Amino acid sequence: MTKRLLTTILTTLLTAIGLQAASSFTNVKLTVSGMTVTMSNGKTTIKIGSNGRASSMKWGSRELIDGSHGGIYFDYTTAQGNKALSPSDLKIIKQTDEMCEVLYSATSGNTIFQQGYIMRNDIAGVYTYVIATGTATSASEPLKEVRVCTRLASDMLNGYVDYRMNGKLPTNAEMAEAEKNQIQDATYYLSDGSVYTKYNWANFIERDTVHGVWNNNKYGVWNIPVSYEWLNGACDRQELMVHATSKSPITIQMLQGEHLGGAAMVLDEGEKKLFGPFLIYANYSTSPLVNAKRIALEQQEKWPFQWFDNDLYPKKRGNVTGHLNVATGQRNDSVRIVLTQESGTELVTHTHGYNFWTTTDANGDFILKNVRPGKYTLYAYALAGDVTDELQMEDITIGEGEQSLGTIDWTPKRYAKLHWMIGENNRRSDGFHYSDTVRQYGLWNLPPDDLTYVIGASKPEKDWYYAQTKAGTWTVRFNLDELPRGNAVLTASLAGCTNAGSTVKVNVNGKEVDTWKPGVNDAAIYRSAVNAGRHWLFSTSFSASKLKKGTNIISFTMSGNGKNGGFLYDCVKLESGEAITSGISDIQTDIQKNNDTGKNKSLFNLTGQRVTSSYRGGTVCEGGKKVNYNK
């Protein structure tokens, strides 16, 4: 048998079973007919229709997506329902041997949308991005969900979100049967009696470097966000990633969402926001997941992309360093630092501008890389220890290049005596019973109606639960060797609240001292969240005379939580004595020292104020005084 004949036979066999590998990368080819586009780079070929939807994406001759159900498409949801892009214009932005870029644009709507597609000659798949522009009527139609979806070929059933959530997705046929037995939104009984819900396949944004699907023939399609600076709500947001439907498996790149505590987006008139570019990556590999993870890391190293030209995308950025000093002597390591372009509200509800985040190291130092030039508010909150307060510093101007914020002195609210604390502050329920469980429908059935937690004897990982989900009373029993003087302060950091009616009455030795009710539904508990929804902070001050020497009881009685609702707990602590607090206005920071000597003048024109979550989940100013560091 000749070598040529053997090659022909092998090629025929591989093609027959869908394993024909694509050829090497070539120069990018772009073909345009009216508003229909075809892009190819030798490895992958993508066809985009006049509606702005990609109806085909092939690896060699192998079709990877389901064009009959939308393929790759942008859509958004409002109170009026789901809406598509509906473009009326197509522009060729760039066409070279290295890359091509096209932009589909709508020209009407309460919010104007555009979607771009980019193919390069060194990566398989396609980059895409979305530009949203506010109009005078944007407020009449708040945007609940904004996303780019990829409908996959029916055999793409190996799903991956992270190391904990991955595995086989139900087939289209299995989902068709399941959808006849709906429990709640996107939640169904499968034929074997188990429950399938897309919310099991959600993830925290900060954990998501790549998510996607692959088939048993080793072809995969992956979403690689590269940078989440553009996602509304910053690092504590949770969003949908991968799930199954009766039409097709689907991967989702959420751009904006209300899921699990987020808020609807309303852009101001003339305000523009760029989401992306992110990569929809195609591969064929003996280990598609390992390959996709490697590519994700490589893409992150290349951010910001120097090949992407857009007025909304600055290539020259700032690297911002600083040192956090916690003046009360509490931990300054493991503190989240966030730069965001909104202020005064809970981070997960932010919908304007861009976000950047990091965590302080063992010395309290931090660095934020590749920050877009602009004006920001700095948020800081602990991810470990007993600090439940929050820092905000407004009007921080970031420019290009290396910049230092110097030392930021923070005096979080603290009292002379910490009697006890259940859990550790990090805005999540981890460390409590069932909190290490993967997302799953029905977990809320496991916590008890009533419990007693004994300080010094009970263990949080066994005796305190991730959520209080049933009408009943949770009791904390503790001893005091002596009676505190003055006031005592009971603080609860909630990782979430599901169902707006969820209410806890707080009693100290049988006397009611407060009622805790966020009044907002983040849907976290019944949508499979185990660790968090939207954060809330409650702090109740009461006369220490309500306590006594010896055994004391503080109880938390849940009511109004309805079906599958309640509180997710982060931590609960009891303090007493004088407050060890002072506003940031009382402290001269290194920032001011630098400004006094002429340093940082190009960096700062800021005012600083410390604010904390209020007792009802909003924000209040501590001290009420803004300080200009550029005096």
Description of each model-found segment:
Residues 364, 374-385:
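A short, solvent-exposed beta-strand micro-motif common in secreted/extracellular proteins
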